[in-house]
Amino acid sequence: MLEHLDGLSTATPGDENTYLHKRLMLEVLGENVSSLDERLHEELLRRVMGTSLWLCHEDIARLVVQFCVNLMSTHTGSMLATCLEMLVESFLPPRGYPAGRLEDELETFMRSGQSPSPMRNSSVDMDEDSSARGDGDLGPPPRSAAETTVIVVGAITQILTLVPLSATVLRGVLLRRIPHKTAVKARQCQYLRAAFALVETPAGRPLRDGLLRGVLRHLLD
């Protein structure tokens, strides 16, 4: 079973058999989260929640998010912290994201006040992605920061709505994950854009004051 959860970030419909197996496995897992045990199924959980929402295909991203939301609605405890850590970590792109793309999107946003259209079929993006990953299975072209932020914030707001306890856990995660002051500007800005997008939602609004205080301390350091 675990082999079908390998390479979720790079799976594409082009490899029909493998892709369908991965999709089916995620669908089954998402419908049976109540049967999962954190200790007995640690490796399975690690593989699913380790999927990059920046790099994976749209269908895979949707199923991974649904898995996390379903998991949190039936399990709390340390699983809640683990899942929220993974989602907040996804505010920022992983290793393998095309170099310069985050900076380009920030520059566009600063100039026009709008993020680039979240399209994933640009040949430029494909070329950058090929050079960044440098392996045989390149997977789908990466999505933009704007598109990924919508996916991640949507998942977290669902969890906040379904699991009221999650707000207490998330408050600490949001502050702890703020990039270090030495991090490049684009990463710091992307994290804060995602965090503020979250706290401006009805579900995330109770976290707004705490985030503002944390960001102020971060700026004064």
Where are the language model's segments positioned?
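Boundary/linker elements of alpha-helical solenoid repeat scaffolds
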Residues: 20-33, 45-46, 62-72, 134-139, ...
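Alpha-helical repeat/alpha-solenoid scaffolds of the HEAT/ARM/MIF4G superfamily
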Residues: 77-118, 139, 143-221
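Intrinsically disordered, low-complexity serine/threonine-rich segments
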Residues: 115-117, 122-123, 130-131
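Internal amphipathic alpha-helical repeat/solenoid segments
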Residues: 1-60, 80-92, 102-109, 125-129, ...
